[in-house]
Amino acid sequence: ALIDYFRKYGDKYDIDWLLMAAQGYQESRLDHAARSAVGAIGVMQVMPATGKDLGVGDITEVEANIHAGIKYMRWMMDHYYGDEPMTKLDKALFAFASYNAGAGRISQLRKEAAKRGLDPNVWFHNVEFVVADRIGSETVTYVGNIYKYYIAYHLLIEARDEREQAREKMKNLNEGAP
């Protein structure tokens, strides 16, 4: 299932798999049949040329598509933000913004954020304000949606785990009852 691929490649590339699943949801609603007007393919909406460059196999296959999307995000995080004094989450958020608006543009806007007295290494309530001001809401909405889906996925996983723990406790209580 999709979750297994997100876990596998999230682990391989040291990126929170829930964050990548959230990006997949933003890109395609996790629909591997999705195709964009510009030719992006699958769950992660990978362009064929990018998929070929990444060397992960046939991106028309769901596993290779998810592999490509996660590998590409890891490359963006390392290439553009690897040496930046940011949290892992901010590196991912800036990589998403760069994916959406272009790394050069985001780099310029980080510098502008610093000039405005904002933290150029923090996305939320800092660089996102400059991005919204200079290029509009699309990138801010894109990154914000991914983060909202990420939080929702986290809450769902926590609730599931709590239910399983409660069931196990009830089972143990029932087994110990006379």
For each feature predicted by the language model, list its residue ranges.
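Catalytic glycan-binding domains that act on GlcNAc-containing polysaccharides
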Residues: A1-P178
